[in-house]
Amino acid sequence: MKKEILLVLLCILTNIVFAQEINQVDVNGKRHGIWKKNFDGTNQVRYQGEFEHGKEVGEFKFYKLLKMKSVLTAVKEFNVNDNSAFVRFLSSRGKVISEGKMVGKFYVGEWKYYHNESDKIMTLEHYDEKGLLQGEKLVYYKDGVIAERANFVDGKLQGESKWYSVKGVVLKAFIYDNNELHGIAKYYNGKSELLAEGHYKRGKKAGLWKYYENGELTREKDFSAPITRKKKQ
C-alpha cells in the first residue's frame, strides 16, 4: 500500500516538475525550451515544439480539433541556420497531403501535392523567395501521366498552357499574358482532332473563330467589336 502511495506521489511530482519546465521564457522574455499549448478551454494540444531564445528549433507539431480531439495536421522541421522549415501537411488520417519549404508564411522552392489515398504526385509547383509561383507548374493523373502544364512569372500565368487527356493527347492549348488569356487558343477531342480555334484578347474571344467536326470546318463566328457609326447631323 505504501509503495502504491509513493508511486502516485512520484507521478504527481513528476507532472508538476514537467509543467514547470515547459512554456518558459529567458531573461529577455523570449520563449525558451519546450512549449506546449492547448486549445482554449480544453486539454487537447494545439501545438508543441522547442524554442531557443525565441527561435523555433527542431520539430514542431500542429494540431486541429476534430470531434474534440487533437488531430495532427502539420509537422515543421526548422532549419538551425535560417528561418526556413521543411513542412508536411497531413490529412486527418495521417497521410501527407503536401510538402515543401516555408520561410515564415511563404512557400519557397519546390512544393509537392499528392493524390488522395495515394503517394503519387498530383501537382508540382515552384515558388520564389516572395512566395510567388515561378516557372513550370505540372499536374498529373494518378498514373503519372501529365494532365496540365502551365507557366508562371511572378505568380501570374504567362505563355503557353496545355491540358492533356489520360492518354497524353492535348485537349486545350492556350496563351496567357499577365494572367489573362491573350493569343491563339485551340481545342481538341480525345482523337487529337481540332474542334475549335481562335484568339483571345485580354480574356475575351476576339476576331474570327473557326469550329470543326471530323476535321471539317463547319462554321465560323466573328467576335470582332461592332463598328459604331455616328449619325449625320
Model-derived segments and their meaning:
Residues 18-233:
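Glycine/tyrosine- and acidic-biased, solvent-exposed loop/turn segments at the edges of beta-strands
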Residues 1-23:
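Bacterial Sec-dependent N-terminal signal peptides
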